[in-house]
Amino acid sequence: KGSVIRFLANEFRKLGYTISFALFNAANYGVPQIRERVIIFGVKGNKRIPLPQPSHSEQGVNGTKKWVTLGDVIKDLPKPDESEYIPLSKRMLQYMPLVKEGENWTSLEPEVAKEAMGKAYELGGGKTGFLRRLSNSKPSPTLVTSPIMPATLICHPTELRPLSVKEYARVQQFPDSWQFSGKISDIYKQIGNAVPVGLGYMAGMQIIRFDNGELKGNEDKDNVIPYSRYKNTTDKDITLFNMNMKNLVLNFE
């Protein structure tokens, strides 16, 4: 009973730490991907690390830069050979030619959509990952450990294939020189499980700035750009000692 966040917060407090946390959207920190993860900052004593303000936003407002898109980071890569990606299933190859860039199964004609989705057609929820073709003009959706899972398909914007492992690595901001090992499925898993470089850099730099005395005061600046797409996901929004789980939204895609 109770949440993991509340448990961790109480344990840190017992050890004498002051914590701050939020659900951060990686796209708001220069990552070409909508990937939302909780980051908890902790300091021994009464000082609190302020939450880092977004450097990017969808429209580039309030002094932020515009989101980095998928096309921005993969457009210069050469066409991959077949050893650099897992092929789509026969079923996907049957229907994906009908899906345009940035669309998914909902763009199909009703009868075709019902046939393509099979039993999944009757499932609840948005099902936005089914027969999903990415858009070059938007950040990638959250990369998962396999790009060809039916409910979370990561299909290239214009080609009949998923993103290659090199494209996966670009989205997660690995240097091109980074060497991965193992089978192609293992490499996808390694990359999909990683923390995007920009998100880790944001957290690390905030700690360094705090340690160097560059952050004045314990309070956050006025947050004009939301940290994520969801509400009530920071330590200021939630009463740690009496959390109402209905107010804690942690629905990751």
Features from the language model and the residues they span:
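Conserved Class I SAM-dependent methyltransferase catalytic core
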Residues: 1-34, 38-43
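S-adenosyl-L-methionine-dependent DNA methyltransferase catalytic core
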Residues: 11, 37-186, 190, 194-253
